[in-house]
Amino acid sequence: MDAPVSFSLGAMGPLLRKLDSLPVAPEIRLPEPLKDGIELLKEDLEEIGAALVEQSMVDSPSHRARYWMDEVRDLSYHIEDCIDTMFSMRCGGDDGKPRSVRRHKVGRVKVDGFSKTQKPCTRLARIAELRALVREASERHERYQLGDGRASSSSSSSHRVFTAHGQVPAPCRNLVGMDEPKTKLTNMLTDEAELHMKVVCILGSAGIGKTTLAEQVYRKLRWQFDCHAFVRASRKPDMRRLLGAILSQVQLRIRISDTSTVQSLIDNLWEYLQKKRYFIVIDELYETATWDIITSAFPEDNNCSRIMTTAGIEGVALECCSYHSVNIFKMIPLGLDDSAKLFFNRVFGSEQQCPYELNEVSYRITAKCGGLPLAVIIIAGLLASLPCKTELWYNIDGCLCSSVTTDIDLDEILKEIISLGYDNLPHYLKTCLLYLSLYSEGFIIWTADLLKQWISEGFIAVIDGEDIEEVAESYFYNLVNRGMIQSVKTKYNNQVLCTVHHTVFDLIIHKSKEEKFISAIDYSQTMPGNSLEARRLSFHFSNTRYATEVAGITLSQVRSFAFLGLLKCMPSIMEFKLLRVLILEFWGDNHGCMSFNVARICRLFQLRYLKISSQIIIELPAQIRGLKYLETLEIDARVTAIPSDIIHLRSLLHLYFQDGIVLPDGIGCIRSLRTLKYFDLGSNSEENIRSLGQLTNLRDLHLTCSAPKSNQQAKRNLVILASYTGKLGNLKSVKFSPGDSGMDISFLFYGIGISVDRSRTASSLPFSVRTLELPSICIFARLPDWIGQLRKLHTLNLAVRELIENDIDSLAGLPDLIVLSMHIMKAPMERIVFNRKAFPVLKYFKFICGTLRMAFQAGAMANLHRLKLGFNAHKGEKYDNILVGIEHLLNLKKIAVRIGGAAEAKESDRMAAEAALKEAIRKHLMFLDDLDIARVECVKEEYKCIKKKHKIKIEDSISEKNGDSKKQHSVEKKAVWGKTMKNIADSGVFPEDYTMSREQRVAEGFVVGIEKCRAEDAAERIIRNVPVDYDGLGQVSTSKIQDHLPELAPRAVQNEKFGSSNDLSIMIQINKYARLPSYEWRDTDISKLNFRLLRAPMLLEAVTARCHLLDLILIGSNNITVLDLGRPTITKLPASIECLPNLRYLRLQGTQLKSLSEVIVKMPTIRGLDIKNTKTEELPQGILRMKKLSHLSMGEKQKNIQVFMEKMQTLAETVQDSDDLSDETEGIADDEGEFSTRANASTPKVDEDEVDRRANNFIARFRKQITIRNSGFAKKESSIDERLWIRDLDECQLSKRGGRF
């Protein structure tokens, strides 16, 4: 096992490995003298390296020994820097051949020290100088006589402790001695007789469990308040961050602006909390000044609001409670029994599993912990890592004796035990723990980020065959189990947030400074002396009042730099030369800085880790291929552009950009990639999606679809993705989430999702997948069969339109499924039953559906801890058996329920559902720790809530158009909403691929003309968003709206009582429908139906092929206005068509009709006739008598079009469609004779007198408008004069001219 970078050995281990590999590196050809010099240097370093290891294992080294170790560590860093400077000037090109950095012109900036290759003689002389320094250090070691030090048995241990797959052992989560304090504190906070805002403070020494108690009470009570927040302060709190955290929790989905000041945050909090019942927890208050600032943000009202604080100083506690000592809850240490119980749980699992010979010493050690839970946890973590040998345990007991005196000081006991726990850590764990001093006190850290930083720093030592990330994870959980790191929150997907207890933080800050490992500087500190030559440096300059630029620090040697604060305090990147880790989190100020240029990072050739978080736009360099060691690139900010050569970063492991970013084509070239977040299916090319199949090392794939060009494109991209993911044999996690802007797949509403047919996207996901999250953005028609084949699945989150019992059975057998989240769009007809032994290891279950019908049999979900439910209350529904068998969930700890309201449901219905649910839980789950039931507006179903969302969007758009949202616009909002829903419902009657013309919508009466906008233009606007075909002027003539309304239209058909689906049972129940599709109907079906109110049947092949069925429907349907017979099975018109006195629109497109019956000309109400793509070549002469015919659509077969242009008295406008000429003119005419036209701008002008003469003749002959669509006639030369003749009318500007025919 190679030695990693460590605080005790410096860079000695990596340096020796580097010197060992240099002479044989294929990309560097070294002359023999230089190879010999490198070999001699390595031998010298190995000698002093061995002495350094010996000294690092001494318990209490002398001052002289410390001085020598510091010198050798610095020397190892210095030599590695020199080696990197001399030999890291080359980077691989596209073809893998070595090229100089100058060839790439990185950033077009000259790089000092790297501009040209050093001569071999120069490098040989430099190696000789380094050898001289090493020999001097070796001589001082002999002169100081440092070879007699004795190694510590504890600190010399290199034993590594691993935990199973990143899980904190179950005993770590067991709480001891909390029941009684929790009950008392809860009673203090829930006294409803005290209406005024009340403050309760938990007082106790460090490590006694104040935070744990506050968290338990907070989780229990928070749902009883309108809003709530839990934040942690510190001894040097960042007030802006603290107040921003409160505001973001009480006012969800708010984004704190960079320009927000402390006072503006206080004002926003004060305003938002007015007249609200709030519950705020402020943990770890140290100063009254901090409390004075925070409390000014909370209005003192009579809404029973509560604030809970924790403090270790009695004066601070009294100040918080306005010196009402009765509101101070004083915590007392654990008794010996509780301390022993906690100890045994942590070490052995229970006291019964403790070896007999260790029982007595265990009680002795526990008694010396002073009843402090943190002390017990740390000492238990120490002993759990040691062999169960009596002598070792008694040695630990002996070390604790000095901590216990007759006058017990709990703070000193805790410090002593923390110090003992630290001293007994292996060196590799000490290094990782000390690295946390890079962050400020109380900072919440994402574990995933921390592990990647450890790896980039070189702290992780791996043995052949081990995965470096798994080893890093084992380091982390080892420190958690030892109590050195605290897990703040573990999300359902196993993402962990962590921090460090302030007492532990004090220790690692002290040790880090002592070892010159990390220098952390904040605005309140003077510049420490050891920061001048720091290798790892962090700045915390978030206070706008005191933050200033730092001077006097040399940055060229800094290897790791973390910056948190105002952008103006950020040092120039040009000053860094050897950075390996760069962490930037900055914000602007009131001066309006909008962007930050980090193009100079292309100089940092040793960079391994780069993370930038900001609301400011980041300008990346145009090229970064010179960063050949870069492993993590994470930009949590908007960027101007992605470097085009990012695909050439051969060492890149983790790539993160915000959603919506278009990655350069060829992303599959980064074969080393393990994490890709986010890959946008909407903006990336299909070729780039295919290239994902080349990322054979990919483990975590985060997908989004922020802005697809169309719903069809999104579906097509999903199919492409599914066909290539099977090649990713190492894939463990697939997550699909909507982008920040949502996924706009419809012109009508926002972010519904992609409707996915499971047969079309049959998954080729590898069996290695452990996490699959496909939430409501991707909706399956049914649960895909292939999900049951993913036997290693750990987390599953998906949405399906419909769920049946067999689907649950296929999931119940997954052996490793721990997290299951399901969103069911269509309410099941039968109760969902979870059978005995179903989901044996499931711990988290979330189920969202319009109705709550489920039952748990005995033995189902035996290990379930958290249950989240969401459903809608319905009008008049009874909830006697709302959760059948919930008493069988014996390990359930937390329940969260959201109760919405279905259509027509009242508040009383939601209250009834809530009362029934609480009663069921109270009766059967007395042991429950956390119950959260809340009434919400609506739980998303297939139709109801989407409808409301669309309605809100319409109202907002009208308000925006008018500049406000005053009441005078309510009529307009209502009118627009009504028209929209009619068109949506009309779409829902038809199948997905059915196309509708704008004339059909006008004939239905859904779209009417208004001033300056005729009905046809209004219809064109409605169907504009989903075009299928265009007319000559580029206007949409037909559309497929159903394809873009997978959620709304089908349910709108039923809920608006507008049409009916193919579900015969529903149709018979409603018995009132205006529009009707028919599929596989039989004679017996039709006999059950009443067609009296039918207005628009859509008759498919099953009916049109049988004339007697068609006659059965049409006879007696006097209200039919639209009739679609456009099916190839129609060879003649049914005789019953003459029984339709109100028919306005007749569609015969695609039929086999050879001629039109004279019956049609006897129907004076017809306004639209579509005979395109039929075999009809001649039109009946009687068609000239159809006075109301305004739309006639014909094809090439109608050869007698010229006759109608000359003879048809009602012709007001002729339009010829042509793919070549694309000419069309549409007119407006009414019964008053008003007429105007719009013409193509390219129309050639003619003589004005001729135009006037033609116009007068035109108006004299015709009084109404007709639009004739012909797909082939416009290509004939004979039609050119007629087209120009019509176009010329536009120049006449005809209005109020002419009269009745």
Curated annotation (Swiss-Prot):
Keywords attached to this entry: ATP-binding, Coiled coil, Leucine-rich repeat, Nucleotide-binding, Plant defense, Repeat
Role summary: Probable disease resistance protein. Resistance proteins guard the plant against pathogens that contain an appropriate avirulence protein via an indirect interaction with this avirulence protein. That triggers a defense system including the hypersensitive response, which restricts the pathogen growth. At the opposite of cultivars Aichi asahi and Sasanishiki, the cultivars Nipponbare, Mokoto and Hitomebore don't recognize the effector avirulence protein AVR-Pia from M.oryzae.
Sequence similarity: Belongs to the disease resistance NB-LRR family.
Disulfide bonds: none
Keyword Coiled coil: yes
Region of interest (Disordered), ranges: 1214-1249
SUPFAM superfamilies registered for this protein in UniProt: L domain-like, P-loop containing nucleoside triphosphate hydrolases
Tissue: Expressed in leaves.
GO biological process: defense response to other organism
Residues in LRR repeats: 604-627, 629-649, 650-671, 673-697, 728-751, 790-813, 861-885, 1020-1043, 1060-1083, 1117-1140, 1141-1163, 1164-1186
Signal sequence, renumbered to the chain: none
Name recorded for this polypeptide: Disease resistance protein RGA5
Positions of the NB-ARC domain: 181-464
Protein's UniProt keywords contain Repeat: yes
Comp. bias regions, Acidic residues: 1216-1234
Single GO MF descriptor: ADP binding
Record region (Structured coiled coil (CC) domain): 1-177
